Amino acid sequence: MKKVRITAVRKASYPDLMALYENPMENACSVEEGAVFIANGWEKPEGLCDSAWQSMSAFVLTLACGGEDIYSGWMKNRHSAMISCNDGFRPVSFLLEAMEEEAEL
Protein backbone atom coordinates (compact mmCIF):
# COMPACT_ATOMS: atom_id res chain seq x y z
CA MET A 1 0.00 0.00 0.00
CA LYS A 2 1.33 3.45 -0.96
CA LYS A 3 1.23 6.83 0.69
CA VAL A 4 -0.93 9.46 -1.02
CA ARG A 5 -0.06 13.17 -1.27
CA ILE A 6 -3.05 15.49 -0.79
CA THR A 7 -2.51 19.08 -1.96
CA ALA A 8 -5.03 21.90 -1.50
CA VAL A 9 -4.86 23.53 -4.93
CA ARG A 10 -7.80 25.95 -4.85
CA LYS A 11 -10.07 27.45 -2.23
CA ALA A 12 -13.27 29.16 -3.28
CA SER A 13 -15.71 31.27 -1.29
CA TYR A 14 -19.29 32.25 -2.05
CA PRO A 15 -20.22 35.16 0.26
CA ASP A 16 -23.54 35.68 -1.54
CA LEU A 17 -24.63 32.13 -0.70
CA MET A 18 -23.34 32.48 2.86
CA ALA A 19 -25.40 35.66 3.34
CA LEU A 20 -28.53 33.96 2.05
CA TYR A 21 -28.32 30.53 3.66
CA GLU A 22 -25.56 30.01 6.21
CA ASN A 23 -25.65 30.67 9.93
CA PRO A 24 -22.46 32.54 10.87
CA MET A 25 -19.58 30.19 11.68
CA GLU A 26 -16.77 31.00 14.06
CA ASN A 27 -14.31 28.36 12.85
CA ALA A 28 -14.80 27.96 9.12
CA CYS A 29 -12.28 26.03 7.02
CA SER A 30 -8.67 26.81 7.87
CA VAL A 31 -7.04 24.93 4.97
CA GLU A 32 -4.94 27.24 2.80
CA GLU A 33 -4.04 26.83 -0.86
CA GLY A 34 -0.76 24.96 -1.17
CA ALA A 35 -1.22 22.99 2.06
CA VAL A 36 0.08 19.43 1.70
CA PHE A 37 -1.04 16.40 3.68
CA ILE A 38 0.31 12.85 3.40
CA ALA A 39 -2.12 9.97 3.86
CA ASN A 40 -0.44 6.88 5.25
CA GLY A 41 -2.50 4.30 3.39
CA TRP A 42 -6.10 4.67 4.51
CA GLU A 43 -5.31 6.81 7.59
CA LYS A 44 -6.60 10.41 7.64
CA PRO A 45 -3.68 12.84 7.79
CA GLU A 46 -3.38 14.97 10.90
CA GLY A 47 -4.78 18.46 10.35
CA LEU A 48 -7.13 17.54 7.50
CA CYS A 49 -10.76 18.28 8.34
CA ASP A 50 -13.17 15.39 8.74
CA SER A 51 -15.55 16.68 6.05
CA ALA A 52 -12.80 16.87 3.43
CA TRP A 53 -11.60 13.38 4.40
CA GLN A 54 -15.12 11.97 4.00
CA SER A 55 -15.21 13.43 0.48
CA MET A 56 -11.91 11.91 -0.59
CA SER A 57 -11.20 8.83 1.54
CA ALA A 58 -12.50 6.30 -1.02
CA PHE A 59 -10.29 7.87 -3.71
CA VAL A 60 -7.27 7.93 -1.37
CA LEU A 61 -7.76 4.24 -0.56
CA THR A 62 -8.11 3.37 -4.25
CA LEU A 63 -4.87 5.19 -5.12
CA ALA A 64 -3.05 3.78 -2.06
CA CYS A 65 -3.97 0.24 -3.15
CA GLY A 66 -2.62 0.77 -6.67
CA GLY A 67 -5.84 1.81 -8.40
CA GLU A 68 -5.38 3.98 -11.45
CA ASP A 69 -7.26 5.69 -14.25
CA ILE A 70 -10.22 6.55 -12.03
CA TYR A 71 -13.26 7.21 -14.26
CA SER A 72 -11.42 6.04 -17.41
CA GLY A 73 -9.30 8.90 -18.68
CA TRP A 74 -10.49 11.60 -16.30
CA MET A 75 -6.99 12.67 -15.16
CA LYS A 76 -3.81 13.20 -17.21
CA ASN A 77 -1.86 11.42 -14.44
CA ARG A 78 -3.45 7.96 -14.11
CA HIS A 79 -2.33 7.79 -10.46
CA SER A 80 -4.17 10.92 -9.32
CA ALA A 81 -7.61 12.41 -8.68
CA MET A 82 -9.06 15.91 -8.17
CA ILE A 83 -11.60 16.00 -5.35
CA SER A 84 -13.38 18.84 -3.57
CA CYS A 85 -14.73 18.91 -0.04
CA ASN A 86 -18.46 18.98 0.69
CA ASP A 87 -18.62 22.61 1.85
CA GLY A 88 -20.89 24.35 -0.65
CA PHE A 89 -20.05 27.79 0.75
CA ARG A 90 -16.23 27.55 0.73
CA PRO A 91 -15.16 24.43 -1.19
CA VAL A 92 -11.51 23.40 -1.37
CA SER A 93 -10.20 21.42 -4.36
CA PHE A 94 -7.60 18.78 -3.51
CA LEU A 95 -5.18 17.01 -5.85
CA LEU A 96 -4.60 13.42 -4.73
CA GLU A 97 -1.43 11.70 -5.99
CA ALA A 98 -0.20 8.20 -5.26
CA MET A 99 3.41 8.28 -4.09
CA GLU A 100 6.11 5.69 -4.67
CA GLU A 101 6.75 5.52 -0.93
CA GLU A 102 5.16 2.61 0.92
CA ALA A 103 2.71 3.34 3.73
CA GLU A 104 3.88 2.52 7.25
CA LEU A 105 1.08 0.36 8.61
Predicted regions and their residues:
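Short, compact, well-ordered microdomains
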Residues: 56-105
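Short, flexible N-terminal segments of the mature chain
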Residues: 19-44
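Helix-coil modules at protein/domain termini and other flexible surface or pore-lining loops
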Residues: 4, 29, 83-86
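Short, structured beta-strand/loop micro-motifs enriched in basic residues and often containing a Trp
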Residues: 2, 8, 13-22
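Short, charged beta-turn/beta-strand-edge "cap" motif at the junction between a beta-strand
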Residues: 12-13, 41-47
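Intrinsic-disorder/low-complexity, polar/charged segments enriched in Ser/Thr/Lys/Arg/Asp/Glu/Gln
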Residues: 3, 36-38, 91-93
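A short, structured loop/turn motif at beta-sheet edges
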Residues: 1-3, 30-33, 100-101
